[in-house]
């Protein structure tokens, strides 16, 4: 059983690390184009209109390319996140209280402290305060990609720990989006989405093992959630949680769906999201821009808040209970991984797009600068600390 779990984690890590490289390249290309003579073409691409219409007025969705990517494209990513969360809770590193305690407490600390640091820096700025959820997230693709590049210098137990923390972070981000970044709720559409969720539950109880029916109902829920005022990507999570873990014959519909979807998310969905959202013009960016409260709060939250929260909460748990460090891991290595948790990128950019939706365009630039700066510094510092801890043996 342990060998199966270890092999599954290795496969997951390998796909995430390769996807992380492509994710970084996509963000870099977007950044370069946004600061080149071709930046107008980049903006035109993001504003390409797309419409879906069914019936007379029953369904009419008309959005630019950027919104389609953030609303529909990312729902696929959240579907995969939902599958990962369910698997880990039922049959993975989070399946038992003893296994889950350290990464769960670490993740909670890693979400709370960055949010508090951001809020403290932006206190007295009503619009700026809306971004408190931005530095809470960890980008599992980027962070694991950096760990894998270090090879045997980092024990496998730390990679498993980082995976678990990032998954719990994703769960926290989902709850933050659901409860804090929603407005203009439509009771009718919420009721329709709720009925759709009941249909999913019925499919699960009826032991329907084919994933197709769940996806069809999930698309209907996506439309209802989109029109309800809650962010539509949450439909992906709702759908994923209904997929059965086991079929009673030794197979797992959930794991089959997860393994089939992972390469598409790693090599297509997330790189496209990064390309569409990481482009920011640095023209006119000065030291004064970098010291605005929003980018400062994000960068400090990721670079300082994340390691303090993850490491501090873990240290307290280990000192006060019988919890232990991951196997074959030293405190110096553990701290290096805690710093890597500050690589926020994908989810941070996504929450930023929700937090300042409808606000002045300057906030969008500030969010991207803060996320890029905080994630880059966290990645560099984490790798340096892990290399130094290896040499100190």
Curated annotation (Swiss-Prot):
This is Na(+)/H(+) antiporter NhaA. PANTHER family: NA(+)_H(+) ANTIPORTER NHAA, SODIUM ION/PROTON ANTIPORTER NHAA-RELATED. It comes from the Bacteria. InterPro entries: Na/H_antiporter_dom_sf, NhaA. One of its GO terms (molecular function) is sodium:proton antiporter activity. The chain crosses the membrane at residues 18-38, 65-85, 101-121, 131-151, 160-180, 184-204, 210-230, 260-280, 298-318, 334-354, 369-389. Pfam families: Na_H_antiport_1. Na(+)/H(+) antiporter that extrudes sodium in exchange for external protons. Belongs to the NhaA Na(+)/H(+) (TC 2.A.33) antiporter family. It is found in: Cell inner membrane.
């Amino acid at each position: 059983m342990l060998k199966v779990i270890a092999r599954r984690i290795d496969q997951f890590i390998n796909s995430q690390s390769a996807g992380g490289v492509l994710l970084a390249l996509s963000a870099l290309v977007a950044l370069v184009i946004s600061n080149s003579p071709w930046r107008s073409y980049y903006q035109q691409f993001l504003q390409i209109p797309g419409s879906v219409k069914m019936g007379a007025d029953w369904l009419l969705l008309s959005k630019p390319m950027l919104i389609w990517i953030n609303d529909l494209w990312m729902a696929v990513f959240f579907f995969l996140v939902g599958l990962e969360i369910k698997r880990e809770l039922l049959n993975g590193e989070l399946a038992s209280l003893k296994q889950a305690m350290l990464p769960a407490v670490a993740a909670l600390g890693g979400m709370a402290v960055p949010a508090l640091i951001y809020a403290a820096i932006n206190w007295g700025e009503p619009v700026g305060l809306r971004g408190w959820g931005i530095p809470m997230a960890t980008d599992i693709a980027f962070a694991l990609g950096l760990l894998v590049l270090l090879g045997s210098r980092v024990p496998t137990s730390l990679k498993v720990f980082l995976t678990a923390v990032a998954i719990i972070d994703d769960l926290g981000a989902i709850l933050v989006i659901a409860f804090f970044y929603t407005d203009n709720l439509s009771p009718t559409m919420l009721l329709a989405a709720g009925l759709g969720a009941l249909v999913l539950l019925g499919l699960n109880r009826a032991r329907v093992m084919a994933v197709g029916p769940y996806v069809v109902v999930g698309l209907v829920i996506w439309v209802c959630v989109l029109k309800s005022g809650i962010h539509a990507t949450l439909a992906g999570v709702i759908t994923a949680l209904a997929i059965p873990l086991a079929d009673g014959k030794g197979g797992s519909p959930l794991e089959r769906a997860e393994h089939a979807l992972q390469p598409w998310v790693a090599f297509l969905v997330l790189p496209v999201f990064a390309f569409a959202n990481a482009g920011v013009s640095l023209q006119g960016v000065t030291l004064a821009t970098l010291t605005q409260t929003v980018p400062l709060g994000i960068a400090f939250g990721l670079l300082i808040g994340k390691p303090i929260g993850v490491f501090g909460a873990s240290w307290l748990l280990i000192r006060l209970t019988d919890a232990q460090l991951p196997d074959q891991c030293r405190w110096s290595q553990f701290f290096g991984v805690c710093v890597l948790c500050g690589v926020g990128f994908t989810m941070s950019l996504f929450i930023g797009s929700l937090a300042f939706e409808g606000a002045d365009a300057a906030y969008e630039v500030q969010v991207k600068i803060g996320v890029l700066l905080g994630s880059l510094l966290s990645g560099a510092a984490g790798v340096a600390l892990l290399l130094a801890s290896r040499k100190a043996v």
